[in-house]
From Swiss-Prot:
<keyword id="KW-0808">Transferase</keyword>
<comment type="function">
    <text>Member of the two-component regulatory system LytR/LytS that probably regulates genes involved in cell wall metabolism.</text>
</comment>
<dbReference type="InterPro" id="IPR010559">
    <property type="entry name" value="Sig_transdc_His_kin_internal"/>
</dbReference>
<dbReference type="InterPro" id="IPR050640">
    <property type="entry name" value="Bact_2-comp_sensor_kinase"/>
</dbReference>
<feature type="transmembrane region" description="Helical">
    <location>
        <begin position="185"/>
        <end position="205"/>
    </location>
</feature>
<keyword id="KW-0418">Kinase</keyword>
<keyword id="KW-1003">Cell membrane</keyword>
<dbReference type="GO" id="GO:0000155">
    <property type="term" value="F:phosphorelay sensor kinase activity"/>
</dbReference>
<dbReference type="GO" id="GO:0071555">
    <property type="term" value="P:cell wall organization"/>
</dbReference>
<protein>
    <recommendedName>
        <fullName>Sensor protein LytS</fullName>
        <ecNumber>2.7.13.3</ecNumber>
    </recommendedName>
</protein>
<keyword id="KW-1133">Transmembrane helix</keyword>
<feature type="domain" description="Histidine kinase">
    <location>
        <begin position="379"/>
        <end position="461"/>
    </location>
</feature>
<keyword id="KW-0472">Membrane</keyword>
<feature type="transmembrane region" description="Helical">
    <location>
        <begin position="2"/>
        <end position="22"/>
    </location>
</feature>
<dbReference type="InterPro" id="IPR011620">
    <property type="entry name" value="Sig_transdc_His_kinase_LytS_TM"/>
</dbReference>
<dbReference type="InterPro" id="IPR036890">
    <property type="entry name" value="HATPase_C_sf"/>
</dbReference>
<dbReference type="Pfam" id="PF06580">
    <property type="entry name" value="His_kinase"/>
</dbReference>
Length: 584
């Protein structure tokens, strides 16, 4: 009997070792945490069915109360029986997967035992189904509460399952005396082994899941602590100053060798190891970062070659690079570097991903706040334009002069002035208007300007018929046309032409305003739309405001694009196509 106990202990040990190895694989951890899902149920069924079949074929042959052999068996003599760990696998399948898993595993286990044969082999098919039902329905009770059976309860059910098998051997045996002799020999070792094995199996699962839960709790705490300390910085945007403050906090609180943050083209900050050549304000030098910006997906590197730094003395050997997203576009990257590859763990990767998500949200919130401010600024400027004494008095004086000369034209201009004020007010209160309404606004403005300066400029429209209902931000064309009138022609009084072009395809609207003026100075061209540029006729703040609004609403693809030569300037932008019908 003691020899049987030792041999069974070996079989149980094999199953437990395999279970321990599986529970260290992330896929199986996830499966155990989602065991109520159908996909997990089928995976558990296949896993425990393989365990059950293995248990049957690695059993210990017993005949006339003696151990005959412990080799792998495919067939038994008609008078022989077998001691194995089959009941353990069926019971565990039920406790973990519930009745669905247990019944299928029980049938598979019973049929494979029936195939091996031996004395009263059909008995084990019957007992397998009973054991599956009992353990399966108890497992179902715990699944409904999203818990697992305790180790003690597992040990009790394990012993009970083996006791049921002993009872089935006695009840369904053809030779009661032989059955009783068999039960006397195998009952105690098998009940003890099944009870102990079930308890250990459950303890491995429970301890692994508890450790996983504790790890997640620590990660969550770390993420919240870092997020809480970095919260104020990214709300102001992805700048060198905000990036450096955030990187220093992360380096202090996390087990990493270096932290870097970039925008799409440049290193904003790099603190920690390798700071001598990973320098802020310089272009991105690692191939890994360039790949993340290109694909928008997290990337890992586990060697210097994979990082792609061209400095031979770089001490960085491992890295995690996560994209920072704004409105589903890559705005930059968050990079964790390691001088020891073993520090680059799965938990660090998950923590990095969580931080990147939070930082991306903060950047989006910051941009939304900036857009709100820009819209308010645009509204204020628009309202100011309505009561701008210079513009207002010039228009009124022009109309007054025309009253005596051409009263009908004066009446039309007065209506245009009213239309201009009304359109300005409506545009200031809406995020988008149709291209048709924007053109009406432009016409009203041009009518007033042409009345003041007859024949000074000519406006030519090239508008696709499908464009009229496409939605655009207010004042886009008006600002571009007004900019051309004020800055393009300087003191030239004739042959001044402005072309307004709108082209529409299925995905985007292309707006272009082109003039034949004197062009923009080469030293000022890169600054136009990026910042205020002082000149004799203004500061260019309207173009800067418009450009920032377009980028904030639609991304960098919608930014104003300037081309200028000595024979004219072309300003264009590409806006995603949305019609008024789609927005209603």
């Amino acid at each position: 009997m003691f020899n049987l106990f030792i041999l069974l202990l070996e079989r149980v040990g094999l199953i437990i070792i395999i279970a321990y190895m599986l529970m260290n694989i992330n896929h199986f951890k996830t499966m155990m945490g989602e065991r109520e899902k159908l996909r997990s149920q089928w995976q558990l069924t296949i896993l425990f069915a393989l365990f059950a079949i293995t248990s049957n074929f690695t059993g210990i042959e017993i005949e006339n109360g003696h151990i005959v052999s412990s080799n792998i068996y495919y067939q038994l003599n008609d008078d022989a029986s077998m001691a194995n760990t089959r009941v353990l696998t069926i019971g565990m399948s039920g406790l973990i997967g519930g009745p669905f898993v247990a019944i299928i595993v029980g049938i598979v286990s019973g049929l494979s035992r029936l195939y091996i044969g031996g004395a009263n082999a059909y008995t084990y098919l019957i007992s397998s189904i009973f054991i599956a039902l009992i353990s399966g329905f108890y497992g179902y009770r715990t699944m409904r509460r999203y818990t697992y059976p305790t180790v003690l309860m597992g040990a009790i059910i394990g012993a009970l399952n083996e006791a049921i098998q002993m009872a089935c051997i006695l009840i369904f045996a053809n030779d009661t005396a032989s059955a009783w002799s068999l039960v006397q020999f195998i009952a105690l070792p098998m009940i003890l082994i099944n009870s102990i094995g079930t308890a250990i199996f459950l303890s491995i699962i429970l301890s692994t899941l508890k450790q996983e839960e504790q790890t997640r709790a620590i990660q969550t705490h770390d993420v919240f602590e870092i997020a809480n300390k970095t919260l104020p910085y990214f709300r102001s945007g992805l700048t060198e100053q905000s990036a450096r403050s955030v990187a220093e906090i992360i380096l202090k609180l996390m087990n990493v060798s270096a932290v870097a943050i970039t925008n799409r083209t440049d290193i904003l900050t790099h603190v920690g190891a390798a700071s001598d050549h990973h320098v802020a304000k310089k272009a991105i030098i690692t191939d890994l970062s360039k790949e993340v910006i290109k694909t928008g997906h997290l990337k890992e590197a586990h060697s210097k070659e994979e990082i792609g730094c061209n400095n031979p003395n770089c001490s960085l050997t491992s890295a995690i690079v996560i994209p920072l997203m704004i409105n589903q576009e890559v705005a930059g990257t968050l990079k964790f570097y390691f001088t020891n590859e073993y520090e680059n763990t799965t938990s660090t990767k998950q923590l990095a991903r969580g931080l990147a998500d939070i930082f991306s949200s903060q950047l989006e919130l910051g941009q939304a706040e900036m857009q709100s401010k820009l819209l308010k600024d645009a509204e204020i400027k628009s309202l100011q334009a309505q009561v701008n004494p210079h513009f207002f008095f010039n228009s009124i004086n022009t109309i007054s002069a025309l009253v005596r000369i051409d009263s009908e034209k004066a009446r039309k201009l007065l209506l245009q002035l009213s239309q201009f004020f009304r359109s300005n007010l409506q545009g200031a209160r809406n995020n988008t208007i149709t291209l048709g309404k924007e053109l009406q606004q432009v016409e009203a403005y041009l009518a007033l300007e042409q009345a003041r300066f007859p024949d000074r400029f000519t406006i030519q429209y090239h508008i696709d018929s499908s464009c009229k209902h496409v939605l655009i931000p207010p004042f886009v064309i008006q600002i571009l046309v007004e900019n051309a009138i004020k800055h393009a022609f300087k003191h030239r009084r004739k042959d001044n032409i402005i072309d307004v072009v709108a082209h529409h395809d299925n995905e985007e609207l292309t707006l272009t305003v082109r003039d034949n003026g004197s062009g923009i100075d080469d030293d000022k061209l890169p600054l136009i739309g990026q910042m205020s540029v002082d000149s004799e006729t203004g500061t260019g703040s309207a173009l800067e405001n418009l450009n920032r609004r377009l980028i904030g609403l639609y991304g960098t693809k919608a930014a104003l694009h300037f081309e200028s030569t000595e024979i004219g300037t072309t300003v264009s932008c590409h806006i995603p196509s949305h019609t008024i019908k789609e927005d209603i």
